[in-house]
Amino acid sequence: RQMCIRDRQKLMFLESIGDPSDLKKLDIKQLPALCDELRKELIQTVEQNGGHLASNLGVVELTVALHYVFDIRDKIIWDVGHQSYVHKLLTGRFKDFSTLRKKDGLSGFPDITESQYDAFGTGHASTAISAGLGLAKARDIKHDDFSVVCVVGDGALTGGLSYEGLNSIDGTNMLIVFNDNDMSIGKNVGSATKNLSRVRVRKGYLKFKSGLEKTVGKIPLIGKPIVKFLKSIKRAVKLSC
């Protein structure tokens, strides 16, 4: 892929990130500009190399938020492996991103041999919770100290391996980020899907969501930018798959 110097110079925030710790040096008000740069890089690279564009455009803000909040030693597992392009860009692979999906280049999925920040080699879907459970149990046995975060969609949550992980998770300190974007290859069916649909329209849930937005919005200086950023995350995850 050829990219002119002028285009590269526009990615001033992205170029400054060598690992996730550099992301924390940015002010929260600068994150939307970083997200714009990430989208430009995604579109330009996938246009040249092929790959999964929509699913990655849809999790730009979500990925930035996770790496901004969690520590560099924490483990983030993407249940849909081909949704990890933004994660790669924020974990020291920006300079090599033009090699994505090429021979001897970056993998289109998380690869534990490619980066210390790829905690597990996920493929398509439903493995993250069980994999995260294994990492969390090993951490506790070794008395280590890091968080385990699994990003799982509503479609992947219908997979049997997800249920296996949930069945064994009791008492384990780990976090599941539920990417409820109403997206899957086939139509979601079953009681889990029905119950999730009910939650989305419950008055209690809607009241809580509205109250949380108002409370956060009242925080001096940073309240409104945080609300705006969270809304952009919500819009983005609805487009992801």
Task: State the predicted function of each range.
Residues 1-5:
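Short, small-residue-biased leader/transition segments that mark boundaries at the very start
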Residues 6-91:
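N-terminal amphipathic, basic-rich helices that act as targeting or association modules
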Residues 13-19, 41-45, 106-118, 215-229, ...:
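Gly-rich Lys/Arg/Thr-decorated short loops/hinges at beta-loop-alpha junctions or inter-strand turns
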Residues 31-35, 55-59, 124-128, 162, ...:
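Generic structural signal for well-ordered, non-membrane alpha-helical segments
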Residues 36, 40-47, 71-72, 102-105, ...:
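Generic secondary-structure signature for well-ordered alpha-helical cores
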Residues 52-172:
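Cofactor-binding active-site loop characterized by glycine-rich and histidine/acidic residues
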Residues 159-179, 192-200:
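A short alpha/beta connector and helix-capping loop motif
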Residues 181-241:
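Long, well-ordered, tryptophan-enriched scaffold segments
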